[in-house]
Amino acid sequence: MASLHISISAEPIATIAGLHITNSILASLIVTILLILFFVAAGASLKNTGKPSRFQSLVEFIVETFRNMVRSIVESDRKVALFTPIIMAFFFFIIANNWFGLLPGVGSIGFNEPVERAVEATAEGTIVEAGTLIQPEQVFIPYLRAGTADLNTTLALAIISVLLTQIYGVSFQKLGYFTKFINFSSPINFFVGLLEMILEAAKIMSFAFRLFGNIFAGEVLLAVMTFLIPLVVPMPFYGLEIFVGFIQALVFSMLSLVFFNMATIGHGEEH
């Protein structure tokens, strides 16, 4: 008999050359392909010199909205041109993965997999044999799972964001950027530098677990509600998860933008 199966880690659904392909990897791959197709079409529409179509107007509105959002924080044309594509990539990849997990069939179409549960054999309260009693059980494994509901995906996004922060810092401040981490001018500055290193590492954990925790918790909530009370009752929670998916994508993108900007300015310019 199949039972409700909730796994923190993504489940492998195939193996290629010894590498496990998980349901979250497959979902992220589908989302990436769809985003590439969308932005290729968007780029082609922007080259149109005739009367703009509705799609072109939508693309121009989206791009201009992100440019204005970035400009409101960085106030530099060079940084706007540099940061806007990255922030858009973060936002659309995250929100597409968040919302992809809410589509019909995602998380609900899969296969039943038999598992074995080991139960220690006992008799009259005394262990008779150090053996096991095999009880077959079926657990449901979905073919697709939201990429951002997998800690590996959110951790990768967090590492990319923090690495880009360091790259932009070095690009704008040259070697002077590292004085925020290594500063022997005074004991206090040396201690502050150590704290800065810890904070940079903490950003990775904060980014990764905030996004993963919110999206995974939403998936668990929807799975439990649908399993216990199907049809009408889970619908308001889908609306909530649409909102949460948008907010989490926006928070990740805006925090990345703020950290990018802070890394490109000297300590004296931050205040």
Predicted regions mapped to residue ranges:
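Selective transmembrane helix interface/packing segments
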Residues: 1-271
